Curated annotation (Swiss-Prot):
Keywords: FAD, Flavoprotein, Oxidoreductase. It catalyses: N(alpha)-methyl-L-tryptophan + O2 + H2O = L-tryptophan + formaldehyde + H2O2. This is N-methyl-L-tryptophan oxidase. The gene is solA. GO terms for molecular function: flavin adenine dinucleotide binding; N-methyl-L-amino-acid oxidase activity; sarcosine oxidase activity. Gene3D superfamilies: D-Amino Acid Oxidase, subunit A, domain 2 (3.30.9.10), FAD/NAD(P)-binding domain (3.50.50.60). Pfam families: DAO. Transmembrane segments: none annotated. PANTHER family: FAD DEPENDENT OXIDOREDUCTASE DOMAIN-CONTAINING PROTEIN (PTHR10961:SF7), PEROXISOMAL SARCOSINE OXIDASE (PTHR10961). Its EC number is 1.5.3.-. The lineage of its organism: Bacteria, Pseudomonadati, Pseudomonadota, Gammaproteobacteria, Enterobacterales. It comes from the Bacteria. Monomer.
Length: 371
């Protein structure tokens, strides 16, 4: 049997692609080395932010706006919504390059972003403390996503639509042959007209030439009371310290507030090097500088987890076909800010499988930029 599309890596992007391609009428096989959603990639830990006025560059805004439409649609398939519109407050010094990019993206795309000075920030959210030279850019329409619920939903919907799924089955090789691609697994060989490689952190085990560096990261949950909950209108947030360190976090749920540091981490070369939380000395204290200065009412660390970023050299995505193989699409290098785009990236992969041109300018994400 020859599939229309085989997906290698069925985490965030792969799960979305499996659903959207199957829904479009294609014969699809989803493969994953584990049973998604799982703890071995970048999608676990309950929640991920979604921001529209994008501080990483306005080239992402059309993608994230389409992603939001797809998240809203996905939320209709569950009693518990995948997307929670908590609002996101972006905090930092008034001369922050990241905040300047947020403001520019908002202006270019007429997005609702409210600028607050330090006094206004503390007045609205007394739990937050910032220096006098800080500003906040508040995105009322943004919020957070329930990442594992999203993947569970896509996988369920894809299966119900007739998608074949092969999990707990690593891929060992890919062969390009004539008019198709053969994927070699522990379970046998499978062929397709086209392949999506969305293998996340460990994509280099299949494609060692890709410029992707795995980085071990951690996030943790800290003791928090009802003041920090979404019921009290406490928002999700990003925060930049005066030294440039970047943090992100979420409203407290069940008296626990989740926070992580975006920059930093440990470069690794294999899965065994991704040590569990607390096995690196700095894990438990990584968020302390932010919590002490910005959220001083937060209590002790309750628990945490480690994950991985698949970083590209410029921390922009890689969305491109393999050189010389137009039937093989690679989506990788999401660099720790990719989950919010998983829905639209899955749709892009489904369009690729159908032979449709991309609905977006993907030039900034081509592999050729690294030559």
């Amino acid at each position: 049997m020859k599939y229309d599309l085989i997906i290698i890596g069925s985490g965030s992007v792969g799960a979305a692609a499996g659903y959207y391609a199957t829904r479009a009428g294609l014969n699809v096989l989803m493969i994953d080395a584990h049973m998604p959603p799982h703890q071995q990639g970048s999608h676990h830990g309950d929640t991920r932010l979604i921001r529209h006025a994008y501080g990483e560059g306005e080239k992402y805004v059309p993608l994230v706006l389409r992603a939001q439409q797809l998240w809203d649609e996905l939320s209709t398939h569950n009693e518990e919504p995948v997307f929670v519109r908590s609002g996101v407050i972006n905090l930092g010094p008034e001369n922050s390059e990241f905040l300047a990019n947020v403001a520019h993206s908002a202006e270019q795309w007429q997005l609702p972003v409210e600028r607050l000075d330090a006094t206004a920030i503390t007045s609205r959210w007394p739990e937050i403390r910032v220096p006098e030279n800080y500003i906040g850019l508040f995105e009322s329409e943004s919020g957070f996503l329930r990442s594992e619920l999203a993947i569970e939903t896509w996988i369920r919907l894809a299966k119900e639509a007739g998608c074949a799924q092969l999990f707990n089955c690593p891929v060992s090789a890919i062969r390009h042959e004539g008019d198709g691609v053969t994927v070699v697994t522990e379970d046998g060989e499978y062929s397709a007209r086209k392949v999506l490689i969305s293998a996340g952190t460990w994509v280099k085990s299949l494609l060692p030439e890709l410029p992707v560096q795995p980085v071990r990261k951690v996030f943790a949950w800290y003791q928090a009371d009802g003041r920090y909950s979404i019921k009290n209108k406490f928002p999700a947030f990003t925060g930049e310290l005066p030294n440039g360190d970047q943090y992100y976090g979420f409203p407290a749920e069940n008296d626990a507030l989740k926070i992580g540091k975006h920059n930093g981490g440990q470069s690794i070369s294999n899965a065994a090097e991704r040590l569990p939380f607390a096995e690196v000395a700095s894990d438990g204290s990584e968020a302390f500088p932010f919590l002490r200065s910005v959220l001083p009412g937060i209590g002790c660390c309750l628990y945490g987890a480690s994950c991985t970023y698949d970083n590209s050299p410029d921390e922009d995505f890689i969305i491109d076909t393999l050189p010389g193989h137009d039937n093989t699409l690679v989506i990788t290098g999401l660099s720790g800010h990719g989950f919010k785009f998983a829905s639209v990236l899955g749709e892009i992969a489904a369009d690729f499988a159908q032979g449709k041109p991309a609905a977006f300018d993907l030039t900034p994400f081509k592999l050729s930029r690294f030559k």
